[in-house]
């Protein structure tokens, strides 16, 4: 039984089950999903995108998501927003 559990854990490491943290990406505009103080909408949007927990990061006015796949997150390197909303 211990060997089976060990093999399962090793397979997760080899497969690369990885979740990241970051700002949610609006795939239509390429921008971050904006918010003001609405943690509930950010949390639901984060969970819809397979994240664990989301909240409105007030200083950046954008939804921050913890535990989401990288494909659902905005990245500075691939930023295509150019100020569009």
Curated annotation (Swiss-Prot):
Keywords: Disulfide bond, Ion channel impairing toxin, Neurotoxin, Potassium channel impairing toxin, Secreted, Signal, Toxin, Voltage-gated sodium channel impairing toxin. Expressed by the venom gland. Residues 1-19 form the signal peptide. GO terms for cellular component: extracellular region. One of its GO terms (biological process) is defense response. Its main location: secreted. Disulfide bonds join 31-81, 35-56, 42-63, 46-65. InterPro entries: LCN-type_CS_alpha_beta_dom, Scorpion_toxin-like, Scorpion_toxin-like_sf, Scorpion_toxinL, Scorpion_toxinL/defensin. Belongs to the long (4 C-C) scorpion toxin superfamily. Sodium channel inhibitor family. Has the structural arrangement of an alpha-helix connected to antiparallel beta-sheets by disulfide bonds (CS-alpha/beta). This is Beta-toxin BmKAs1. The lineage of its organism: Eukaryota, Metazoa, Ecdysozoa, Arthropoda, Chelicerata.
């Amino acid at each position: 039984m211990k060997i089976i559990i060990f093999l399962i854990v090793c397979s997760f490491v080899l497969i690369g089950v990885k979740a990241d943290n970051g700002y949610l990406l609006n795939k239509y505009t390429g921008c971050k999903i904006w918010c003001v103080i609405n943690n509930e909408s950010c949390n639901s949007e984060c969970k819809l995108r397979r994240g664990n927990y989301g909240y409105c990061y007030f200083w950046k006015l954008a939804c921050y998501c913890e535990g989401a796949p990288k494909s659902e997150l905005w990245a500075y390197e691939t930023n295509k927003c150019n100020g569009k909303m």
